[in-house]
Design a protein with these regions (language model features):
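Catalytic phosphate-donor-binding core of small-molecule kinases
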Residues: 2-27, 64-143, 152-244
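A general structural motif
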Residues: 3-5, 33, 55
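Short, well-ordered secondary-structure micro-motifs within conserved domains or adaptor modules
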Residues: 26-47
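Proline-centered loop/turn at the N-terminus of a beta-strand
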Residues: 57-59
Length: 244
């Protein structure tokens, strides 16, 4: 890539001869980038998308031995991937993201899910879920609002369904409801959640914000998508990563 006079940035601790090194991915938030490459697991990929403002395509390389649900390749495949990128023999996989807001403050976007749970573990909270003109009220430990990308994550571990990544829907999954309440699949429109106790608002298991009791937490589709570089089309990509 450097031989082709491509300008390359690396984020510490990665170091490549001829590349400009920055200390944190946030230093590239507004940079005009054509491509990003992440080395690590899904957490690294989620963090990268959260910090970059523009819809920059990302090639996710799984390093570390975990499943890498979001990744496209492993390190031994990197030369093949670069060749396909240079020859434009790739396709872009666009995924919806979600963002939460409370009291006129927008929180960082999430690719997988937003998890709202009770702060006080000694009391069961009453959660009110509003969508369009309907309301569901239930005592439970929390609520997950997941995207199709996140349908193989926390929501799935609680019995939620797996969805194809290209769908524009949200999955609302209750966490330990007192009375059994199934996951609810809704169009990607505004969802409002209110709890009668103070709550945590957790984005992709990485960023935690808080809300007071009776605050309205609004979750909606984020204005910008996450864009993945794919070397080949795969109809059930996420399910195959889970071993199905």
């Amino acid at each position: 890539m450097l031989a082709r006079k491509v300008k390359v940035f690396t984020v510490s601790p990665v170091d490549v001869d001829g590349a400009k090194k920055v200390s944190d991915v946030e230093d590239l938030r507004t940079a005009k980038l054509d491509l990003t490459v992440t080395l690590g697991g899904d957490g690294t990929t989620l963090r990268t998308f959260r910090y970059l403002e523009n819809e920059v395509p990302n090639l996710a390389i799984n390093v570390g031995g975990n499943r890498g649900i979001l990744s496209e390749i492993t390190l031994p495949q990197i030369d093949t991937a670069i060749g396909q990128i240079i020859s434009d023999n790739i396709f872009l996989d666009r995924r919806i993201r979600v963002v939460a807001s409370c009291n006129d403050e927008d929180f960082p976007p999430a690719l997988n899910e937003i998890f709202i749970n009770r702060q006080n573990l000694t009391k069961t909270s009453l959660f009110e879920i509003r969508f369009q003109n309907d309301t569901a009220t239930q005592k439970m430990d929390g609520v997950i609002v997941a995207t199709p990308s996140g349908s193989t994550g926390h929501s799935y571990s609680l019995g939620g369904p797996i969805f194809h990544e290209s769908l524009d829907v949200l999955i609302i999954t209750p966490v330990a409801p007192v009375n059994k309440l199934p996951s609810i699949v809704v169009p990607d429109e505004k969802v409002e959640i209110i709890s009668n106790h103070d709550s945590n608002i957790i984005m992709d298991a990485q960023v935690i914000k808080t809300a007071r009791f009776d605050d309205v937490i609004t979750i909606r589709k984020y204005k910008k998508q996450a864009v993945f570089v794919r070397l080949k089309k795969q109809g059930l990509r996420q399910m195959s990563k889970l071993g199905f």
